[in-house]
Every structure is written in C-alpha cells, then in structure tokens.
C-alpha cells in the first residue's frame, strides 16, 4: 500500500503540471472503487487547480468550488501523461487538463477513492486524524505521552492514524529497527529518551524515502512512471531470513494483526 512517502512523492510530481492549469473535464471509466467515485467528479468542467496538498495518505486538489480527495488504496498510482495516450485495463480516472496533460489514475485492485468535498473541515475521512509525522507537533514528548498508558505493542500503535498519520507497515518496521526497539515492546514501556529517538528516526526515515521517490514493491509508480528507489535501502522490511546489515543475524518475520513485521532479534530490544 502506498504510504506517506509515496503519496508525498505523487503530490510533488503532479503539482507542477496541475497548479495554474484548468481541468477541462474528467473521464471516469470505472467508478466502482473502494467508495463510488463522487458524482461531482463526473461533472467537472473548466475548473482551475489552485493547489495540490496532502493530509495523511490523502491527496487534496483545491478547486474554486471544492476539493477532490484522492486515496491511492492498496495499488493505486497517479501519472502525468500527454493527452491522447490510450488507456490500459486498470486506468480508471483521467483529469484532462488545459495544458495538454492528463492526470491518470491507475489502480489494479480498485481499493482507492476519488471523493468530493465542498469543505475539507469535518469531512469524515479526514476527521480524527493524528498529527503529521514531519510536523513539529509530532515529537518525543507527544509520543511518550500517548504511549504512557497504552497496553499494546508499539508497532501497531505507530500505524494507528489517531496517534500519527502515514506511518504504515514499511516505515514502522524500518523506524523501529533504526531506533533499536523491538516491535513487540509494549508502548507503555518506552522511556522518554526512547520516544524522542523514535520520533527523530521516523522523521528521518520518511524524509529519506521521499528523497528516493518512495518505495516500489509491486504496483507503486511515481508520476513520471518511474519506481520509487527506497526499496534498495530497506534494512528489515521484506528481508526475512537475510542477514541484518548491522550484525549479520537473520531477519525475523512475524504477523501483527495480519500485517507482516520484520525485525532483527539482536539489534532490537
């Protein structure tokens, strides 16, 4: 599933081609995504794009009359193409732009979303979200406070959007390795110093992935059609049985709430 770095990479890739241009019309080939494509998107016409923003894993296209909210789901990606290129099997939505470009949404598993909001404030998919991990609001003191009475393992707690947004399976595993914290540790057992370290490495891991264009494991592509290159730097995720790059101990894989967790028994305590 595309996580925060992949969504931010998509935002940065499409923004220069959309902001200042006008959506002439939308082409919806298959509106049966995780939620049905909003009716307002079918009717888009002559709408200039004012900004391209991100909240958590949602892309937000600001138009004069409202917002397009896009979620990439499990396998979605956005590409900027030249108008006239024929669609392929899993190309479900196009935004045809006034500058001769097309924003094309591809999603083999159709678990993404294209929604419309007159106002963002209070929209159900954006309500109750925690802070952005790259913001000043997410820090060691905040994390320690939220972990203090939490009798659950730290790994799934990091992936809870009420705590912090956008830290999915890949980056939770990688951040815990970088901090030397075992994913099964109770959140309440973390000291303030450990929370401060963990908050710092989460930011560092996410920023490094954004620099590398995100992580491509299967479906994700950047807006120019290229894969994300952070997969080449993964320390534990997807490396079951391979030697730890630090100590040589074989990487272990377990399941947490049906999600794979990867860690080093020697480096993480």
Swiss-Prot record:
Its EC number is 3.2.2.23, 4.2.99.18. It holds the Pfam family zf-FPG_IleRS. Keywords: DNA damage, DNA repair, DNA-binding, Glycosidase, Hydrolase, Lyase, Metal-binding, Multifunctional enzyme, Zinc, Zinc-finger. InterPro entries: DNA_glyclase/AP_lyase_DNA-bd, DNA_glyclase_Znf_dom_DNA_BS, Formamido-pyr_DNA_Glyclase, FPG_cat, MutM-like_N-ter, Ribosomal_uS13-like_H2TH, Znf_DNA_glyclase/AP_lyase, Znf_FPG/IleRS. Belongs to the FPG family. PANTHER family: FORMAMIDOPYRIMIDINE-DNA GLYCOSYLASE. Monomer. HAMAP family: Fapy_DNA_glycosyl. Involved in base excision repair of DNA damaged by oxidation or by mutagenic agents. Acts as a DNA glycosylase that recognizes and removes damaged bases. Has a preference for oxidized purines, such as 7,8-dihydro-8-oxoguanine (8-oxoG). Has AP (apurinic/apyrimidinic) lyase activity and introduces nicks in the DNA strand. Cleaves the DNA backbone by beta-delta elimination to generate a single-strand break at the site of the removed base with both 3'- and 5'-phosphates. This is Formamidopyrimidine-DNA glycosylase.
